[in-house]
């Protein structure tokens, strides 16, 4: 039986995807020791935008800090801290922070770790999907 666990996001090592975006897997199956809803903290640098993508499963964004635009197909939503965005399967989406001088931080929620391509990048680079700042 899996044990409960406290995760402090400040102690989770960010995975640097590129010079514009970093990602922290806060909650995932490996971390929890059982199947869970996956939670990721993403940081998009000021004056940047993501490349965008399409996923097979629903994804949910929660905006933590910063303001920006989230595009879902041809629809643009201006978002602020406290907003949620529901991204249905098959929807092309990206984040545009090019008009802002501050970082854009969001939490992403999805059902299975395999539905997020950064999971595989972490596994390839680290041999696992989660690291603390104290690990090499």
Q: Residue ranges of each PLM-predicted region?
A:
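A short hydrophobic beta-strand segment most commonly corresponding to one strand
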Residues: 36-39, 60, 86, 101-119
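Conserved short histidine dyad/triad with adjacent acidic residue
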Residues: 39-55
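A cytosolic small-molecule/anion-sensing beta-strand core signal
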Residues: 40, 64-65, 81
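Glycine- and acidic-residue-biased ligand/ion/polar-headgroup-sensing regions
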Residues: 58-59, 63-68, 73
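Short acidic-glycine-tyrosine-enriched beta hairpin
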Residues: 74-90
